[in-house]
Amino acid sequence: MRPLISICMIVKNEAHILRQSLASFRKFTEEIIIVDTGSTDETKEIAKEFTDFVYDFEWTGNFSDARNFAAKHATGKWILAIDADECLEEESYLQLKKQLKAPTEPIQMAQIISFTGEKGRVTTTNQMARVYKNDGTICFRGVIHEQLEGIDKHAVETGFAPVKIYHYGYMSEIVEKQGKSDRNLRLLEKEVKNNKNSGFVHFNIGQEMNRLGDKKEALKEFSKAFRLRDNNQYIWAKLSAYHISELLEQEKRYEENLAIIEEAKVIWPNVPEFPLKKANILYLHHQLEDAKEIYHSLLDNKVIDYQPIVLYEATNFMPHKMLGTIYLEEKDYTRAMTHFSKAYAENSSDYGVMFQMIMLLSKFHQPKEIFAFMERHNFISSTETGLRLLSMTTQQGYAELSELIVQSLTDVYPPVAEATEVKIATIRNVFPVISESAIVFGIKEELIDAADLCLWHYENPQLPIERVMKNSDVGDIYNFIFENGPRISKKRYLFVLERAIALGKGEYADYLLALRNVYHDSINSHIADLFFQYDFADIALDFYNIVDADEVTKEGYINLINYLVDADVMDEALSIAERGIDNFSTDFRFYLWTIKIDTENRANRISEAMDEFPNNRYLAKLLDEVSVFQDTATNNR
């Protein structure tokens, strides 16, 4: 009987990873075809342990040639192309089989979950055309990152398969071992000479440049790919626009970014990443109402059949997380908790969401109640998760909650347990005593940082901290703070000071503040911001008062406005908001404050804001409301 699906794989010198891949799907697949392109290690021997269908192919420098050769030996009704550095998930594969038994598109996009970086700690999700009908009408094209097309080079109708493929080939150690990027670039440079106008080739070069960290060249190549696309349905065309946006975001070129996003939204209205990216930019620029509108539209949509291309959480987890963040900023704690809870339900491994929920609960509940909530919702699913949460709770000074978390962990390495105990004791103002091994393991587990070490050394100079710090990349911090060494960066100085303020270490904070004189006077504004952040408003005001008005930070102006509004000193709050507009004309928040405070001139204030932000939907609504009110008032006279 003809198999439903043939697994096709091309290999060369993959002995170090091939067995793991084949073992992941041998038991539940019907036919495995392996094509070897010239291995000199044990690749073929390992392949023959799993299948009888192992074939040799003389390498032509073109991956598509090898994939198409493999397809000729496949007898299945459908082909699923897999690489040696990938594994299959059984449950989703069975869902794929069910889908393929019914009428469906000839090409199917698979979900590729890639583990990248050191030890695969970072994951990215992408879609690639990997499943296709084995009827001779479809083939691969392209020397690398092959693309499925009709045999006569026409685009073929494409659907979305439920299958998940886990890709390990871009973990740092595997990339280094295989030299993938260098190999790929050599092949692509050869192909681009023969086909300069191929958008797909430029897209692949962009991918390799991006992976190598050459962001400037990557942006050029993705831009070429986007311009040269000849069919908007190609996944690489959509991904080109996505990567252009990503790279422009990294360079903070927001206007250009919004332009490409708007263009992409028109071309691909069913790709949710583009409105999500627009909302994220609006959030960064404090246009919260417009951002909220987009996030809610992604969640509430019942019209558009969204098809994510990279971020599978673009229509659920991410909008919920961002709405939680915005409502928290607006002090709408009920809505914030609602959205963080929904975000956690979508992705229970996001530490940021968990900690935001913990911080929210700490405003209204006792530590035991918070910990009971954490237990009910399985926050501490592993020792690693518990330690990550501990790192956050101890930095924020939550001593009792941190103790409850420690008590729930049963398999913590003793030096790490010692480090956590000292962190908690520090919050309780207990004299710090810690071994060097506990310091080392605490740093390794990211429980201890330079700010902790400096604080402990200040409180107990007999600890082995000098040696640890001087033999690390934070030796300059120790030298500056304790040995009158060269000035460290402002960022590092404020990082150490913030910990002292967060933990209420007044005497130590005073010691650090005495060192600020080596910096420009504007440092006082940043120090004021820190005191304000941790609710030491009176101390913050003292620092703001010794800073020139032009040196107050944007956050400083916002802090002062909030303080004055809470104190009902509206005239002065309005004056500072106007000064904020003069100094930071592109910051939406200052315009919004003038609209809220200056009710007598509201229409004029809205018009001034719209001159700077002509596309802001919230301002347009406000102006309409004011116009309706004025028309009604005129008619009633």
Locate predicted features.
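Short, well-formed alpha-helical segments that are part of the catalytic scaffolds
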Residues: 6-28
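Acidic helix N-cap motif at the loop->helix transition within catalytic regions
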Residues: 16-19, 41-50, 91
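Short beta-strand/loop segment that forms part of the nucleotide-sugar
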Residues: 30-38, 55, 84
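A conserved acidic beta->alpha catalytic loop
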Residues: 36-45, 59
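Catalytic-site signature of metal-activated, phosphate-bearing donor transferases
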Residues: 65-71, 82, 89-213, 217
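Short aromatic/hydrophobic "clamp" motif used to bind/position activated sugar donors
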Residues: 79
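Alpha-helical repeat scaffolds
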Residues: 219-224, 254-265, 290-297, 333-342, ...
